[in-house]
Curated annotation (Swiss-Prot):
This is Small ribosomal subunit protein uS3c. The keyword rRNA-binding applies. It comes from Platanus occidentalis. Part of the 30S ribosomal subunit. It is found in: Plastid, Chloroplast.
Length: 217
């Protein structure tokens, strides 16, 4: 069996960038890492609670930049209206919540939202879409094909979608996948976006993996 490496970690420094940009002493590094995770979880929970459409979060990624006196959080969203339109003070509220959570009086916390032009070119948003379809008991093949149709509008060069688990409630778990175009996982200069997503259905847990071949550098 071939050993599968995470496509994002494999390309760090060439076509992929870090989502956390800061330096720390070895002693305090783990604290900084846990803090990042808490910030991401806090933002996701807030969006989950305050969104209009129940199945779409629309967060592609969250970047965190830290300086001595400032934590800058950039949320890349496919559908920022979900967060901004309903609550004009949504970002301020989120900022206050995070500030309370970390009671970091000596550090200012700043949140910015960046809109992604083609949200369905992002594997996280696509995985959420497929998860929503599976929860609504749409057949998995139909959900996968629809996801591929959505990416066709975004100028991607290839996509692979994989669903694993008790598909359609069958007794035996299996893996089903579908590929459209090229997905060169071994080419380091190929910019590949990847995401793995867990969805809880009434039959059990399903795993969704999506690889999107964006471009070659």
């Amino acid at each position: 069996m071939g050993q599968k490496i995470n496509p994002l970690g494999f390309r760090l420094g060439t076509t992929q960038n870090h989502h956390s940009v800061w330096f720390a002493q070895p002693k305090s590094y783990s604290e900084g890492l846990q803090e990042d995770q808490k910030i991401r979880d806090c933002i996701k929970n807030y969006v989950q609670k305050n969104k209009r459409i129940p199945l779409v979060e629309g967060i592609a990624r969250i970047e965190i930049q830290k300086r001595i006196d400032l934590i800058q959080v950039i949320i890349y969203m496919g559908f920022p209206k979900l967060l901004i339109e309903d609550r004009p003070r949504g970002i301020e509220e989120l900022q206050i919540n995070l500030q309370k959570e970390f009671n970091s009086m000596n550090r200012k916390l700043n949140i910015a939202i960046t809109r992604i032009a083609k949200p369905y070119g992002q594997p996280n948003i696509l995985a959420e879409y497929i998860a929503g379809q599976l929860k609504s008991r749409v057949s998995f093949r139909k959900a996968m094909k629809k996801a591929i149709e959505l990416t066709e509008q975004t100028d991607t060069k290839g996509i692979q979608v994989q669903i694993a688990g008790r598909i359609d409630g069958k007794e035996i778990a299996r893996v089903e996948w579908i590929r459209e175009g090229r997905v060169p996982l071994q080419t380091i200069r190929a910019k590949i976006d990847y995401c793995s997503y867990t969805v809880r259905t009434i039959y059990g847990v399903l795993g969704i993996k999506i690889w999107i071949f964006v471009d070659e550098e």
